[in-house]
Each structure stands twice: as structure tokens, then as C-alpha cells.
Amino acid sequence: MTEAFPNGKTPQHVLGPPAPAAVFLVLTVRSGAEAEAKDFLGDIAGVVRSVGFRAREDHLSCVTGIGAELWDRMFDAPRPAGLHPFIEQRGDVHTAPSTPGDLLFHIRARRMDLCFELARQLVGELGDAVSVVDEVHGFRYFDERDIMGFVDGTENPEDQEAVDSVFTPTGGDDPASSTYVIVQKYTHDMAAWEALSVEDQEAAFGRHKLSDMEFPDEDKAPNSHLILNTIEDEDGTEHKIVRDNMVFGSVESGEFGTYFIGYAADVSVTEQMLENMFIGNPRGTYDRILDFSTAQTGGLFFVPSQDFLDDPDGELAAAEPSDAQNDDPASASARIEETDPPNPASADDPAPADDSLGIGSLRRRDQ
């Protein structure tokens, strides 16, 4: 059984400890197959349980995201406030492209065979209603490091801060207990990166490579990754997202990369991070890491509550007219306790809150 937030809504299984294995699937839905795709949303939890039941100790889970164009085709209701196609970031030197994507499946487990089997079953159930436009098999790399050798996710929020950073509150513009996710596939020029001295690599990140200790602010370069990924309000309040990046690669092709995936209650936080990285802050002061990293894909998805996936039409009907404005916004913020049960799209017991994922920091864009 699943325990809902105090607002009565059950979120998808976004927060959890870093998994050793993951499969990222981005699909497009064939024109005319919208009804099939919508009907399948309620079946996803059952498929996850069927695959994961045979190995509950390996914590199989799946997060489902819906793209803006598919939302318009599937539902008569307006899009959630933050849902729109991924915004291309075209800087003077580097570009973050916007690429097709109607559905996202973020599959995680302790074993790749479980991830693979779930991916196979999900796509098989959808049949010719969908096409796979991107598939990445990710793995955890040496003490939580990325392929470039630096620890990834050090600044991720934890516990209640993670919940508040990720899930939309009751009484806001979005359905409660939902979130937004942005995904990008980056490939790295490892030969050029490894030709740098460790000192130059550390300057690009703003962090020591071996110890993972952050540089003092006065020692960080203005184009360092940490500087450009710190998002603050005018009053100095820092805004964070939760990311679960994974390494991928092929020795045969020589392609090595990082799959970026970032969850946020306010997607503009992640978008401001990307604008800083690619356009620069100020313009032209782009992220030094991009001289060695190329964004190949870019997608933005709405991740509704599990209640919505189980009955989207019912949830949308219940929201008209919405009495959400009369609710206490704080009621959607719930601490994830160690004893919380898994949500329906997870085949295992939940992870302790102090193992929850977190992220680097970001500055909120004025809207």
C-alpha cells in the first residue's frame, strides 16, 4: 500500500537513493494513438509491480513524464502552468537543442536486467502506438562520480528540502504533488578533457576533484560550473532541484557521456540554470564544461501524481472548478520518513529520506 501526502495525493517515485542502474526512454506517440497512450497510463504501475515482484530487494521503480504536445493531444484541459516544449538555449558558442518527446520513462533499479525488462515490457505493451526516439542505459560510476571524474550530486537537497524543491504544493498553479523534469543527453570529448591538468579541470567545476570540496566563493572562476548553477532570488534565497544524472558510454563507438535529469517543482529554476550555462551570466560567460560537453537532446515533461496516472480524466474533472486555492499550501510538503511505503510505480520498499537525491543550486528566473 502507498501512503499519500497530507493533501491526499500520492506522488510518483521521484525521491530515492541513487540507483546503480537506470534506463531512460523517450517516446513519441503516433498521431491517432492518443487514446491508447492515455489508457496505458493507468497500467504502468501494474507492469512495474509484475516485473519487480520477482526481485523486490532490488528496488525497481519508474517515473512517467508527459510532454507538452502530447498533453494537448490527449486532454481538453489546459496544460499545467509550467508545461511547454523544451526551450532551446542558443549561445554564442554552444547550443542546448530541443528534441522530440511525448513520454518519458525514468526506470531505476539495483540491477540492469530489471530496468531492461521493464523497458521492454512498457514499450511492448504500447506496441505501434509509440516510437522510441531515445534510449540510454545508465550506470553509477565509481563512488558517485561522473565520467569526467568529479562527484555528481553533492549539492542535492535532502529530506524535507528535497520534497519542497521537487513537489508542487497544494494551492498553487499546478496539480498538487506533481513535478517537472528536464532531460538532456550530453556527450563528452574525453581526449580533450583528459589533456587538461587536474588544476584546470577543478577550475572548470569550482570544486576539488579528489576531496570533492568546493572552492571558496572568491576562488571560483565566473565561468565555473558551480557559479553558473547557483540560482538565488534577489533576497539571496537559493533554489535547488533534484537530479539523478547517470554515466553512459560505448567503448566501441568511443561515445561517453552524462544523462542529465533534473526534477523541480518550479521548472524555471532548471531553465535558468541552462540559460546561465549556454547563454552565460553575464552573456558570453558560458559554462567552461561545455567546451568538453555537447548537448545532444533536450526535453521537458510534466510528472503528475500517481493518482493522475491511475485516473487522468477523473483527476482533471475533480479539478473543475478547483478549490485548491482554499487549501493550505504547506499541506503538500511532507517529510519522507524511513518507514514510508513505496508508491504504486515502485516495486520495492522506499529509500530512507537521508539517502534521497539532491542537486546543485540555481537562480530563479523572473516571470
From Swiss-Prot:
Region entry Targeting peptide, spans: 358-365
Function (record text): Cargo protein of a type 1 encapsulin nanocompartment. Has both general peroxidase activity and dye-decolorizing activity. Can catalyze the oxidation of both protoporphyrinogen IX and coproporphyrinogen III to their corresponding porphyrins. Also efficiently decolorizes the dyes alizarin red and Cibacron blue F3GA. This cargo-loaded encapsulin nanocompartment is probably involved in protection against oxidative damage.
Domain notes: The C-terminus (at least 10 residues, not detailed in paper) targets the protein to the nanocompartment.
Chain positions covered by the region annotation Disordered: 311-367
EC number, UniProt record: 1.11.1.-
Family named by the database record: Belongs to the DyP-type peroxidase family.
Binding of heme, residues: 225
Major subcellular location class: other
Enzyme class: oxidoreductase
Active-site residues per Swiss-Prot or TrEMBL entry: 152
Biased composition, class Low complexity, residue ranges: 345-356
Molecular function in Gene Ontology: heme binding; metal ion binding; peroxidase activity
Record's protein name: Dye-decolorizing peroxidase
Species in which this protein is naturally found: Brevibacterium linens
InterPro entries in the record: Dimeric_a/b-barrel, Dyp_perox_C, Dyp_perox_N, Dyp_peroxidase
Subcellular localization(s) per the UniProt record: Encapsulin nanocompartment
Record keywords, A-Z: Encapsulin nanocompartment, Heme, Iron, Metal-binding, Oxidoreductase, Peroxidase
Needed cofactors: heme b
Complexes and interactors: Homohexamer.
Biotechnology: Can be used as a bionanoreactor following immobilization on a glass surface.
Any one annotated GO CC term: encapsulin nanocompartment
